[in-house]
Design a protein with these regions (language model features):
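DNA polymerase processivity clamps
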Residues: 1-125
C-alpha cells in the first residue's frame, strides 16, 4: 500500500485528530490509504475524530486501515518538509520517506476505549 502527501498537511491533520485524546486515553491513530487520500481517525471515551488529506500515487489499503502510536508519527513529520511517501506492508509496517530520510513505525493493536466507572456512594445511616 502506498501514498504520497505533503508532510506539513499530514502533520497538521494528525495533530487535529489527536487533539481530542486525553493523557489517560489509549494513544492510537488509525491510518488508511484511500483512492485519492489518506484518512486519519482516533477514538476515545469522548468520541470519534477523523479527517483526511489529499494524496497522490495511491495504492489503497484495506478499509480497516492500520493503527499506530501517534507520537511516533508526529516526531518524524515535525521535521519533514515537502512531500512524504508512506509505504505500508501487508502486516502494517509503515515506512515514511521524506528529505532523503527514512522512518519505520510498527503497527499496534486497535484502540481500547477507556470507560470511567462512576463510584456509588453508600448512604451513611
Amino acid at each position: 500500500f502506498f501514498a504520497k502527501a505533503d508532510a506539513k498537511q499530514l502533520h497538521d491533520a494528525l495533530k487535529l485528530v489527536c487533539g481530542y485524546l486525553r493523557p489517560g486515553d489509549d494513544q492510537c491513530v488509525n491510518i488508511g490509504i484511500r483512492s485519492d487520500s489518506i484518512s486519519l481517525s482516533t477514538k476515545s471515551e469522548l468520541g470519534h475524530s477523523q479527517t483526511s488529506i489529499q494524496a497522490t500515487d495511491t495504492k489503497p489499503c484495506p478499509e480497516s486501515g492500520f493503527n499506530y502510536i501517534p507520537q511516533y508519527l508526529m516526531d518524524y513529520l515535525a521535521r519533514a518538509v515537502g512531500p512524504v511517501s508512506l509505504s505500508i506492508d501487508g502486516q502494517g509496517l509503515l515506512l515514511m520517506e521524506a528529505n532523503q530520510n527514512k522512518y519505520v513505525v510498527t503497527p499496534r493493536t486497535a484502540v481500547k476505549i477507556r470507560t470511567t466507572e462512576k463510584k456509588k456512594i453508600k448512604n451513611a445511616a
